[in-house]
Amino acid sequence: MSLNFLKRYLSRSTRNFQHVFEDQHGLLSIRNPEIDVPITTIDDNLDERNINGPQSDQEIVNRLIQSMVISKNEETRPMLKNEQLMNIYKHWNLYHKNDLPFINPTKYTPFEFQSIENDDISYINNPRLSVTKLLISGWCELRELYRVFAGSVRTPPTKAMSAGTKLHLKLEQALHGVIDLEDIENFIRSNTEEIMEMYDLVDNDGIFDMNPDDSIAIDWSETIIERLYSLIVCSESREVILHGYLNLQKESFVENEQEIKNPSSVLVSGIVDQIQFENPENSDDFALFDEVQKYLDVEYEQVDETPLVDLSRFFDDVKNIIQCYPEFQLKFTDLKTRMVYQIPSQKSVLDSAKFQTFYYRYFFELLSKDANFAYRCLLENAKRRGLDVDKPLSVLTTFRILRRHYHLFYNDFLKLADGKPIGFAPFDSERIDSDYEFGKLFVLGKDFAQHQEQASQHLKFIESLGGYDSLEYDKLLLPLLKTWKTPPTLRYLAARSAQFYEIFGSRLGDTTTVEYRNTFTGKIIDTKVYNYNNGELETETIHASDFWNGKLDPEPTNDFSRCQYCEFKSKCAIPKIGKISDSHASIGPEVRKFLNDVKHLQKDC
């Protein structure tokens, strides 16, 4: 039996209940015969259309079968019930009474479509993936495909999701604390507005106001630099930013600097819930951290009993200390919240959580092996977001970073202000020096003068800050209130972030864990411990790449109980199949005969 015969047979056999045709965009559509539309048979052009590379006759036949709708009674099918269904029927040009096909009938890969139709516009402006989006097999691959082509609709969080988010935040704040700057920032903003109004100033250079792009600077200073400092000083950190670049064509992650900018390299971001730096043989061993704390207390001046670290010395010194404690290793943990006091029973769900921790561990390996590589990765990350890595941060952003993390940034900011190198060659050779008017903002409106010496006015402003904050601003802020020679930028923060990753490059352990907690009480239900396996992760990465490349026909779940939670269940054939003991019994005799013929063809091939 030839492929052409099957095509003709399919066109003739299906004419009794549905028709398949291609529109001018190459979009495979399924129509109902009661609608008066032009009908075309499936022609030879289908062989080369909407598929990746040469396909065998059998593969094409399989695609034809999968695109068919296998429902018994078309007239009783429910109408489209939600936004996701309406979107996917529109995007796939489907007749609303037909069920969803099992494969993508468009010319776009899932990654391409996600990057042009997405509820979250940031994915259009900066096409990318997340670690969770690589975990396509955790529940149902077919649902993942439908969600992408429905436009990645953002749905309101459920009660369980909101409670889980609160628990994550509670654990994070219990470890890292929160410095509330709302009152002091309101004071600075109102004072700035008064100055701008009195002197008719325009904030062309972002000196006075907060730029939206500065949020990434706050993120890097907090969730990379501060968190990794906590890891080396306190043995633990939560909510740490990680990322890598997945080459979708090679189906592997980028490991060299030259490949980062390759168009096929897709940014993949994630936030690991917890990293611990510990002796796996003795969790009560804190000798390393006692040594680090002793070093900090002896070597650095303190303000408010907090050492002011000189990062130019810190990195090499701490690496030398770590070398004396070879037993300490990193452990990566993902936290899952559960409304009931039991862990998931489905193996695919457990495996998905395991691979999530594997990705985090691997990303940290990539970023920690070489500071220059991590530096380039971070710069590319910012550039893909449309950010200028050499644009000076707003004065308010710089103040926020200084206030929250003065123990890490004060000495560095002195170096930038004086135009001195920070001790990281890639940054020092690429930095752009320009005047940065940091001091102009910190003057009371009534004392402000654009072209006069303002030292005395600065003191008055600092006295006013004392009404909101007990920090010794005369020691930490006053020396910086001048025109800096080198402005703080994302490039600077990328440099320091990269150096913090590199501290741990030789201490990547092979243990990852998934911790299950009750959503409402926070109590630990169970902890799954895994041994990192790079080979397993490579296989998982290839599978995920095939999905996003459009090379993979997604596998539907074989656990029909999962279908009751799916937003596509009313138009998906899988739950219908699950309700009958023999799926062929519900298919019309013409289609059943066709399927039997195909079985014979498979035997003949």
Curated annotation (Swiss-Prot):
Main location: mitochondrion
UniProt-recorded Gene Ontology molecular function terms: 4 iron, 4 sulfur cluster binding; DNA binding; metal ion binding; single-stranded DNA 5'-3' DNA exonuclease activity
InterPro entries per record: EXOV
Binding site for [4Fe-4S] cluster: 140, 563, 566, 572
Location(s), subcellular: Mitochondrion
A GO CC term assigned to this protein in UniProt: nucleus
Residues of the signal peptide: none
Listed EC numbers: 3.1.-.-
Keyword Transmembrane among record annotations: no
Keyword Nuclease carried by entry: yes
Enzyme class, spelled out: hydrolase
An example Gene Ontology biological process: interstrand cross-link repair
PANTHER family (alphabetical): EXONUCLEASE V (PTHR14464:SF4)
Annotated family: Belongs to the EXO5 family.
Name used for this protein in its record: Exonuclease V, mitochondrial
Gene: EXO5
